[in-house]
Structures are given as structure tokens and as C-alpha cells.
Curated annotation (Swiss-Prot):
Domain of life, per lineage: Bacteria
Family affiliation: Belongs to the NrdR family.
Gene giving rise to this polypeptide: nrdR
Name of the protein: Transcriptional repressor NrdR
UniProt remark on cofactor binding: Binds 1 zinc ion.
Length: 166
């Protein structure tokens, strides 16, 4: 494995363990050239998914692009990278389970919003403000009102009615 610091092509594995989701292996490595440590992830090479954009363009699904969008929405929020990785893992798993080679970007956006709403309201609103392309402040306020209403309904539910975190 090539070192990201010095480019040396040999490293040794210090620690190896499956990720929480069990779909990849996390390896802690040490470069044999500069002795710096870095982490790699090994995962099964699955068939590629194609994302169909709103304008009809098609492009390959990139989990890193999805993760970056989540990181941006959760910037300066108390949300760990591990939780965001778990969300991306869950969304990717759900997309692959559809057995459809092409997935509409709107479907992916709705999956993200559903999970962010449960995870962090501020991150949800940030993501929604970009994803939903609100026409004006009034439509944005309507979305906030809907979010608050959904949360109030959740608080009114009885024991066991709460939604579990993904």
C-alpha cells in the first residue's frame, strides 16, 4: 500500500478489524519508508451504481461525494465522522438492495434527509436548504414548520414509539 505521506510503496499492517457495519476491513498501517501511520479500508468491489440526475445526466455513484455532503451539512455540529460513515453505509446498502442499476438522485436525497432529520435538525435544515432548492424564504419557513411539527408528534407518542437512530 502506497504511503500517503512519502509515497513509499511498502507498509506493514499494525491492526486489522472489521468496521461496525461489517462491510469493510479497517487496517492501521505503518510506512516502511518514513514510519508514519495511516488508515486504509478494504471493501468488496461491488457492481457500480448509476445516479440519474434531475436533468437526466447519468454518473457513477460515489460514496465519498455523499459523505462530503453530509460532512458539510454537519459542519460545526456534534456529529462524529463514524456516524456519518454509518449513514453512508446504510444508504449505499439500501441502494444496492433495490437491485436497480440506476437510481434517481431525488431518491438518494430523500434517504439522506430522512436520516439527517433523525440525527441532527440543524444538519437536516442545512441539507434541505441546498437539496430542495427553495424558491423563497416562505417555502424554507414552511419546511422548518413541518420539521417542528414532526418532532412534536414524535414527542407525543407513547413509550416505544420513538424512532431509533441508524
Amino acid at each position: 500500500m502506497r504511503c500517503p505521506f512519502c509515497g513509499f510503496s511498502d507498509s506493514r499492517v499494525l491492526d486489522s478489524r472489521p468496521t461496525v457495519e461489517g462491510n469493510s476491513i479497517r487496517r492501521r498501517r505503518e510506512c516502511c519508508g518514513c514510519s508514519k501511520r495511516f488508515t486504509t479500508y478494504e471493501r468488496v468491489d461491488e457492481p457500480s451504481l448509476i445516479v440519474v440526475k434531475k436533468d437526466g445526466r447519468r454518473e457513477a455513484f460515489h460514496r465519498q461525494k455523499l459523505l462530503q455532503g453530509l460532512i458539510k451539512a454537519c459542519q460545526k455540529r456534534p456529529v462524529s465522522t463514524e456516524k456519518l460513515e454509518a449513514i453512508v453505509d446504510g444508504i449505499e446498502r439500501e441502494l444496492r438492495q433495490t437491485m436497480e442499476p440506476e437510481i434517481k438522485s431525488q431518491y438518494i436525497g430523500e434517504l439522506v434527509m430522512e436520516r439527517l432529520r433523525k440525527l441532527d435538525e440543524v444538519a437536516y435544515v442545512r441539507f434541505a436548504s441546498v437539496y430542495r432548492e427553495f424558491r423563497d424564504a416562505e417555502s424554507f419557513m414552511e419546511e422548518l414548520k413541518n420539521l417542528l411539527e414532526k418532532n412534536r408528534e414524535g414527542l407525543r407518542g407513547g413509550p416505544g414509539d420513538h424512532v431509533q437512530d441508524h
